[in-house]
């Protein structure tokens, strides 16, 4: 069913429709209890498949977002089932772009924003993923359209509709001890969006933090290059080793750059475990970020050390991998 403007669900009045997904429909709403403010209301609308199991998964998503607390995650304030419509719902943060509409990374045209913004979004999305992984949650659907951009220009990770909960205590708290396993096993289907699937998921293996890292890599590869990622060899030994070697590889590549716009190096995300995949993605983002700031000239020895742009400290190696930051030699 579709709610109309003015309809009331869970103490909220519908203002407008924001969007429809596989599990539910999202509306902008305002409180009717005098609390003020506007929120997003997600209502379960699935009417096919194992509806009862999917309903429980929907509620598990809401409960999980109530428990998880991170500045780059959606926050759920209330969840329940409305007697009038007979459907479960949850009320969450309303995340709108600067223009008042819903904006995701899928709305960003490659090349339309500077790489500093992209590096910022990458850091925020990665931080959110590392947090949920530590809590025993695997997102399983990291992609451009599931990373929102708020009015402040920050990235917010959303849509936990097919998340996998690996922590035993969390599964019990969410009341998903057996239900979700049954849903996921249905027809041995692969959970997630095809273009973002890690090789192990295509083989039918379970999702892990490493597969989320792969999906994040594909997401930002697409955002940076405008093309879909295709596995390939590591270029010029890039990321062959941790530590200073990857900085040296960057310098070699940057020294040969004919202009301020450098193609993203070809990297093989499929052959790296979780920790290495984060590094691969970070280097790709860092390369373009450095170029945008003009740092490529400094790293290639074409700019005096004193002229190094301050921006390198704002979104560069320090944030990606503090332990692997190499200071320039005097």
Task: Set out the residue ranges of the language-model regions.
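AlphaC helix of the eukaryotic protein kinase fold
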Residues: 45-67
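Protein kinase catalytic-loop region centered on the HRD/HxD motif
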Residues: 126-137
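Conserved short submotifs of the Hanks-type protein kinase catalytic core
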Residues: 85-100
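Conserved N-lobe ATP-binding subsite of Hanks-type protein kinase domains
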Residues: 25
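Activation-segment/catalytic-loop signature of the eukaryotic protein kinase fold
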Residues: 79
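Activation segment signature within eukaryotic-like protein kinase domains
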Residues: 121-122
């Amino acid at each position: 069913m579709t709610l109309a403007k003015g309809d009331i669900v869970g103490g909220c009045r519908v203002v407008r429709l924001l969007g429809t997904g596989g599990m539910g429909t999202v509306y902008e709403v305002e409180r009717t209890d005098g609390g003020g403010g506007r929120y997003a209301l997600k209502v379960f609308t699935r009417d096919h498949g194992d509806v009862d199991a999917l309903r429980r998964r929907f509620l598990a998503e809401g409960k999980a977002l109530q428990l998880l607390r991170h500045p780059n995650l959606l926050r759920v304030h209330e969840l329940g089932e409305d007697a009038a419509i007979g459907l479960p719902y949850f009320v969450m943060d309303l995340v709108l772009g600067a223009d008042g509409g819903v904006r995701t990374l899928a709305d960003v045209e490659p090349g339309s924003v500077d790489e500093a913004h992209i590096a910022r979004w990458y850091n925020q999305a990665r931080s959110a993923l590392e947090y949920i992984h530590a809590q025993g949650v695997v997102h399983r659907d990291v992609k451009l359209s599931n990373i929102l951009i708020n009015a402040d220009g920050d990235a917010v990770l959303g849509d936990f509709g097919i998340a996998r909960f690996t922590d035993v205590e969390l599964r019990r708290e969410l009341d998903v001890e057996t239900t979700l396993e049954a849903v996921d096993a249905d027809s041995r289907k692969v959970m997630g969006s095809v273009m973002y699937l890690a090789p192990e998921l295509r083989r039918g293996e379970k999702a892990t933090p490493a597969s989320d890292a792969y999906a994040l890599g594909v997401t930002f590869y697409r955002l940076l290059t405008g093309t879909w990622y295709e596995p390939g060899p590591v270029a010029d030994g890039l990321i062959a080793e941790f530590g200073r070697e990857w900085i040296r590889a960057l310098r070699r590549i940057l020294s040969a750059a004919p202009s301020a716009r450098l193609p993203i190096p070809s990297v093989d995300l499929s052959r790296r475990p979780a920790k290495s995949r984060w590094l691969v993605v970070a280097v790709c983002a860092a390369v373009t970020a450095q170029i945008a700031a003009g740092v490529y000239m400094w790293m290639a020895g074409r700019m005096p050390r004193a002229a190094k742009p301050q921006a390198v400290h704002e979104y560069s190696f320090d944030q990606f991998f503090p332990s692997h930051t190499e200071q320039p030699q005097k």
